[in-house]
A protein has these predicted regions:
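Short alpha-helical
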Residues: 1, 99, 117-120, 151
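Amphipathic alpha-helical segments enriched in hydrophobic/aromatic residues interleaved with Lys/Arg
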Residues: 125-157, 163
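A conserved active-site-flanking secondary-structure segment within enzyme catalytic domains
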Residues: 107-135
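Flexible, glycine/proline-enriched loop segments at strand-loop-helix junctions
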Residues: 67-69, 108-110, 143-146, 159
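Extended, subdomain-level signal for the structured scaffold at the beginning of enzyme domains
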Residues: 1-91, 99-103, 133, 157, ...
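Short active-site oxyanion
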Residues: 86-91, 106-111, 142
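Short, glycine-/aromatic-enriched active-site segment of Class I SAM-dependent methyltransferases
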Residues: 176
Length: 198
């Protein structure tokens, strides 16, 4: 969902006339998601030439991956993201993707968020970033982070609104049968989901 949710928002935006191009990239030829879904042949990230105003979206995965030697030693990917950010490419993370951005250093002295179960750990591991708890998404200096899963959809709609206006984002949300648009300031935990014994 961290990948598919925002992807569907942008796809529907294209269907409504947004001038967007979606590219899927990875460090290899294919990926297996944390849920076990195999995603076939994809471009290597280095094949993509980015320009100012583009977006890179890093979906979440098992936190252990972002803490693994395999990820941490992939310096060419890290440098590609850093270079993109210097070119004024917007960098977005969904859920645990914030750990990837923190590791490569582009969240330093910036606000960010992640899934409520991991905000404390993110702040502990990276004390030079400002982790905002209990918000759906943040935006700071061209870097967007979100709490994950459903909030990735909220973030994608926010980006569409910035690019194409409120009414355009409303049309896309309606097409996606979104019950209610949520801003980044909404809480991660819904009061409607509180456990009750009646």
């Amino acid at each position: 969902m961290d990948l598919a949710g925002p992807d569907q928002v942008f796809f529907e935006g294209i269907e409504y006339g947004a001038d967007l191009c979606i590219e899927y990239v990875t460090i290899g030829k294919s990926i297996i998601t944390s849920a076990g879904l195999h995603i076939g042949i994809m471009k290597h990230f280095s094949e993509i030439k980015l320009t100012k105003g583009d977006f890179i979206i890093i979906p979440g995965t098992q936190l252990s991956y972002f803490q693994s030697i395999a990820y941490k030693s992939n310096t060419s990917l890290h440098q590609w993201i850093r270079n993109a950010y210097e070119l004024k490419v917007h960098i977005c993370s969904i859920c645990s993707g914030a750990f990837a951005l923190a590791h490569i250093g582009i969240l330093k002295n910036k606000m960010c968020t992640t899934h409520w179960k991991r905000t404390g750990l993110l702040q502990e591991l990276y004390p030079d970033i400002e982790v905002i708890e209990n918000v759906l998404y943040t935006e700071d200096s061209g870097i967007y982070t979100s709490a994950g899963v459903a909030s990735g959809i909220d973030l994608a709609l926010h980006i569409l609104e910035q690019l194409y206006g409120k009414y355009f984002a409303h049309k896309v949300a309606r097409e996606l049968v979104i019950y209610k648009r949520r801003s980044g300031h909404h809480k991660q935990q819904s009061d409607l989901l509180e456990f009750r014994n009646h």
